[in-house]
A protein has these predicted regions:
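Active-site core of glycosidic bond-cleaving carbohydrate-active enzymes
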Residues: 61, 88-118
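Acidic-aromatic pocket-rim loops
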Residues: 68-91, 97
Length: 218
């Protein structure tokens, strides 16, 4: 676990090709990864479940383990929480707050918002000492274990590449080659459907339709 694989090499190479606008090679590399047995989780949140790490959607992730010689635990519980005192044993650093714009950009019904981001309020945590007007922080990398204190106590791995990344890279490359490519839209819509808690393999009302302008898409 935690070692680079042929799948992670091909997926990373696809990402490099994408930055170089070498779309044909993006399609080539993503095609190879799609033949390697990876699968998307039906539930988006499973990607960040400590009990499901290195699972079917994982291509490469940084490994963390607490109280293990030679292996570091994560300290995301500190980084991604506001500075407050004695809240269920957690103490946050107050680093890396999420912007209001990011929090509000999720569409209504998109389940990813409350998985990815948490809004901390004075009403919920009256002893929170934060000067942030909008104290939102990354939520998906929190380890819920009471043993996961802020200093390297978390066991939640950090995903670098997921199979969903392959879908999205492929969608972008296919669309760049041919803006009416049906597969490009299907790759994108598979990810969108899951985000809204729908069957990934069935057309839905939230699907992105061909022919949208950039402004409409955004």
């Amino acid at each position: 676990l935690g070692r680079a694989t042929k799948g992670s090499a091909s997926a990373m190479l696809a990402k490099v090709y994408l930055t170089r606008e070498d779309y044909q090679n993006v399609v080539k590399e993503t095609s190879e990864v799609m033949q390697m047995g990876y699968k998307l989780w039906d539930n988006y949140a499973d990607n960040f479940d400590v009990e499901k790490e290195n699972g079917q959607e994982s291509i490469f992730e940084i490994q963390f383990k607490r109280n293990t010689p030679g292996v570091s635990g994560s300290n995301y519980n500190g980084y991604y929480r506001p500075p407050f005192v004695n809240i269920n044993g957690w103490v946050g650093y107050g680093d890396d707050p999420v912007t209001r714009n990011h929090y509000e950009c999720y569409e209504e019904g998109d389940l990813r918002r409350d998985i990815n981001v948490r809004l901390y309020t004075k009403e919920e945590y009256p002893n929170m000492s934060s000067n942030y007007e909008f104290p939102c922080y990354v939520n998906k990398f929190q380890d819920p274990s009471p043993l996961a204190v802020r200093s390297q106590g978390g066991e939640n791995n950090y995903p670098i590449l997921r199979y969903s990344d392959v879908y999205l890279m492929r969608a972008e490359a296919l669309n760049a080659i041919n803006t009416s490519d049906a597969e490009a839209y299907e790759c994108l819509n598979v990810i969108r459907r899951r985000a809204f808690g729908l069957n990934m393999n069935e057309a839905s009302a939230i699907d992105i339709k061909p022919g949208l302008s950039k402004e409409d898409f955004l």
